[in-house]
Amino acid sequence: AAAGARWNHVWVGTETGILKGVNLQRKQAANFTAAGQPRREEAVSALCWGAGGETQILVGCADRTVRYFSTEEGRFQGQKHCPGGEGTFRGLAQVDGTLITCVESGIVRVWRDNDKEASSDPLLELSVGPGVCRMRQDPAHPHLIATGGKENALKVWDLQGSEEPVFRAKNVRNDWLDLRVPIWDQDIQFLPESQKLVTCTGYHQVRVYDPASPQRRPVLEATYGEYPLTAMTLTPGANSVIVGNTHGQLAEIDLRQGRLLGCLKGLAGSVRGLQCHPSKPLLASCGLDRVLRVHRIRNPRGLEHKVYLKSQLNCLLLSGRDNWEDEPQEP
Amino acid sequence: MSSVRLRKEIKRRGKDPIGHIPEIILNNFTTRLGHSVGCMFAFLFPHNLQFIRREVATFHNQRDCIFFRLHRYIFKSEKKGGIQELGPRFTIKLRSLQKGTFDSKYGDYEWVHKLWEMDISRRKLHI
């Protein structure tokens, strides 16, 4: 299992602290733990790819440690303790040999990324406001990050720039009863080839912001369902997003017109992680019903794979490589 | 919850079971979800291994419906025993399982019963 770790298609982090690697071609799932027994204190709250392609995974755990996992060797290589602030990790990112962490109380820290030192002082520290639900890095400009949360408006920060945010979103106008609309940004995505951002909220809204335009209010707003939207991902082609809510409903929403394109069925629990493949029309979803599902988004829309993984799944990483089917033969 | 029969509607019932801790029987909770739900029912009652009173509460799962009965048993002879029905009887179906405390609007659901997705086939059972 350790030798075949590099061919795993999906990596899933669970509430018990185990990293599971799933190979959809061979239909196998393997568990990887840092040490011994799985524990609730080490619940995986954030996953991201490390430096150098997809050879390393950074696993952020609830006890404020970031563990380094090598997919080439199939084992954990080291860990780094990241103190400061309260709450679990809400975002992990890596740029230029530094590690960016964001916790729930709003402390964003940039750490020097040498895993030989167990802990060191942060290079940079930002306070983004309490109640953060997500911190996302712009894949096109790795030094830009966006943060948002409950009663914490969307802000885009430049880590190489000043301490003030580059873009601070404004709340929408008061509703028809003249009441302030509450803010609860649950997930953020950067749209490629433009400066726009999409957020999905706990009040079942999907909003598009454009920092290049003079208005700080959302450019487009769409709603779906009656339950909080918990996860979001962009589709290949980037004209639509797929959102999931706490009832397990997955929906594809067009960003040009703001209308519902279609739904995906199958999930029975709250959606915790969603990711689309960058080129193929495949969507991986995981949630509290302990099953990892891979759907095909178009022609035809339906379920491709379903894998029962015994613990509650918190986050996932889908391998973006193209040679899904081609596997080298065992010698 | 459906098919509720309150205590006064049950014919030939026994005396009041109030204050006595019954034993629990869980029947047919086979799937992973069924096992979790069955454990939750068992933990509703205090755990008492003394078996003082001869009362037993049965949760029987058949085709995603859970039937609840409360009986008192006596041993008439070595091999034969008799039961007497006390207590209410009802049938319940699982609608949803939430993570954390009850919050129907903003809470996370571990399992939600979706009528048009899950009840299409008669052969597919969840609990």
What are these regions (language model features)?
Chain A
Residues A1-H9, T16-I18, K27-N31, G36-A46, ...:
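Terminal intrinsically disordered, low-complexity extensions flanking WD-repeat/beta-propeller proteins
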Residues V22, V66-T71, V108-D113, L154-D158, ...:
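WD40-repeat beta-propellers
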Residues Q79-H141, V172:
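Asp-box/WD-like beta-propeller blade repeats and closely related beta-sheet repeat scaffolds
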Residues L126, G131-A212:
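Solenoidal tandem-repeat scaffolds enriched in leucines and small polar residues
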Residues A35-V44, G50-A51, H81-R90, L124-C133, ...:
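WD40/WD-repeat beta-propeller blade N-cap
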Residues A2-W7, L47-E54, L92-G97, M135-H143, ...:
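Loop/turn segments within WD40 beta-propeller blades
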Residues A30, Q77-G78, S119-L123, E164-F167, ...:
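A structural motif specific to WD40 beta-propellers
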Residues G13-T16, G60-D63, C102-S105, G148-E151, ...:
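Conserved strand-to-loop turn within each blade of WD40 beta-propeller repeats
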